[in-house]
Amino acid sequence: MKINNSLLNFVNGMLVTLPSSKTLTLSWNFGSMLGMVLIFQILTGTFLAFYYTPDSLMAFSTVQYIMYEVNFGWVFRIFHFNGASLFFIFLYLHIFKGLFFMSYRLKKVWMSGLTIYLLVMMEAFMGYVLVWAQMSFWAAVVITSLLSVIPIWGPTIVTWIWSGFGVTGATLKFFFVLHFLLPWAILVIVLGHLIFLHSTGSTSSLYCHGDYDKVCFSPEYLGKDAYNIVIWLLFIVLSLIYPFNLGDAEMFIEADPMMSPVHIVPEWYFLFAYAILRAIPNKVLGVIALLMSIVTFYFFALVNNYTSCLTKLNKFLVFMFIISSTILSWLGQCTVEDPFTILSPLFSFIYFGLAYLMLFIFMSSKLLFK
Amino acid sequence: MQRAVVQGSKRGLAALAGVTAASGMGLVYALENSVSASGDNVHPYALPWAHSGPFSSFDIASVRRGYEVYKQVCAACHSMKFLHYRHFVDTIMTEEEAKAEAADALINDVDDKGASIQRPGMLTDKLPNPYPNKKAAAAANNGAAPPDLSLMALARHGGDDYVFSLLTGYLEAPAGVKVDDGKAYNPYFPGGIISMPQQLFDEGIEYKDGTPATMSQQAKDVSAFMHWAAEPFHDTRKKWALKIAALIPFVAVVLIYGKRHIWSFTKSQKFLFKTVKGREPPKAQ
């Protein structure tokens, strides 16, 4: 049946009658799961914001106020804290799935996805700082100082973000406002990401020329996406049983500008980038490598190659990439001593080598079929 | 012949992959052990706490005794600024007991004329801080301010095990280790030299419930109390986890059935290739 309203037709064409391949497995659920977690994080975060004060003398105390005094405040904080980890788990699975199925062929989807990834990293970092614990404060000092490598404007930008000459309560206010506003921007970009995706439909492992042998997105894939609820319930159970396992003990020590922790390590989802940053003993080059570890994947969207997939070779390279990323993450939490100071640059090199090898193959494989 | 060669090379490749993976795992295991071995302190032994399991609750009797240890030993130097006496009500004490505990404490306050006074505490008061500020605390303790104990159980790597080991781990300093006056040697503390001398001794206090107050008993009880203080919601969250975990199988069954119901037509599709009259394949000439 046809509806006269063009907006309804637009939505209908994307969510109900979208032709979808029959072969989309549970790997395609990662995207909808991320949407669920994002909404969940926005809700829990909004409730936490009711009771939080971004003042350097009070921030840590208000976090504990939420834990001790606010009715069920501890639940919201546990969910918000672990929800960030859940988001990154599915984000990385989503990215790897994208690499396996060469989803960078959908250029707009890929570009918007990478942008979302960068924004979510910023969001997670700023949330990390708001706790105003020892690791928060010193992570803020280290990461914001990296911006000083920007030519000409670097020191000015750092001073602006600090709102002073060091990380202070004013910095906390700065981060709190951004931490609250950024998710809404991410939400808009996610909707754009979704629209780009559903304009073309997902890539799949089965090539199908035309739409004659496909199913409607609804109700088939809505039913499949409902499986996410089971994962979500599992997440709730694990959060309640192991609320702080993914955090550091330093998370419970109030920030002290006079004393830094023995080791400063970021959350688990930043460890690979941290390892790459530390692998290069030059500040500027380290920051550039840190950025390129993500920006490299933008280059995939510059290649026009829709059909030439070397599936087995690509699968092998993606597995190698996953292994090297995992090892880099492990290296990121090791102390700076032998043999880790040798392994970090080695695996950073492997990481970039594999990424550019995938890019090269993607560019070249088209020529094989000319 | 060709197939045999392919199979042989595949088997060889699989064997090579297996050996490589095993080597990788071995390397990671060795390096991880070296990471654990790094650091300048002894790692605490894993202890069987009553509340360690995924669905285990606190031993409230132990927590109560731990509060007695805190009040009679730790409170002389350490504050618990996030804890109020009302948190004890109907959790580890009755309301009357909590009120009595509060009344025992001397709370710094200001009277109607603005003069500083000390008054008996009430339920809404925090556990008192023995020092007016951090600098006073440091000055009274050889320059090392005793940290607040509210979150201590979560604020140290090793958690309860570390606290217990630290409190029972004092020993004579090895030859060559210089220990200043007012400090002590404890291998569990980072660096080995700790500003808090040994505080727990056999029969150092007397428990109300008659439990023998050995040093290890006191250490266990005060560790449990400190964990309870850091996580008052501990028992509630595990109860909720158990309830939701019990719910998951039913939700899963409903969702799986629903999805399979939706897909039944698609999954049971059959393709039939038949000749349509008038579109027969051409006859061989």
Curated annotation (Swiss-Prot), chain A:
CDD domains: Cytochrome_b_N. It comes from the Eukaryota. GO terms for molecular function: electron transfer activity; metal ion binding; oxidoreductase activity. Its cofactor is heme b. It is found in: Mitochondrion inner membrane. Gene3D superfamilies: Cytochrome Bc1 Complex, Chain C. InterPro entries: Cyt_b/b6_C, Cyt_b/b6_C_sf, Cyt_b/b6_N, Cytb/b6-like_sf, Cytochrome_b_N_euk/bac, Di-haem_cyt_TM. One of its GO terms (cellular component) is mitochondrial inner membrane. A ubiquinone binds at H198. Pfam families: Cytochrom_B_C, Cytochrome_B. The chain crosses the membrane at residues 30-50, 74-96, 109-129, 175-195, 221-240, 284-304, 316-336, 342-362. Binds 2 heme b groups non-covalently. Its main location: mitochondrion. Heme 1 (or BL or b562) is low-potential and absorbs at about 562 nm, and heme 2 (or BH or b566) is high-potential and absorbs at about 566 nm. The main subunits of complex b-c1 are: cytochrome b, cytochrome c1 and the Rieske protein. Component of the ubiquinol-cytochrome c reductase complex (complex III or cytochrome b-c1 complex) that is part of the mitochondrial respiratory chain. The b-c1 complex mediates electron transfer from ubiquinol to cytochrome c. Contributes to the generation of a proton gradient across the mitochondrial membrane that is then used for ATP synthesis. This is Cytochrome b.
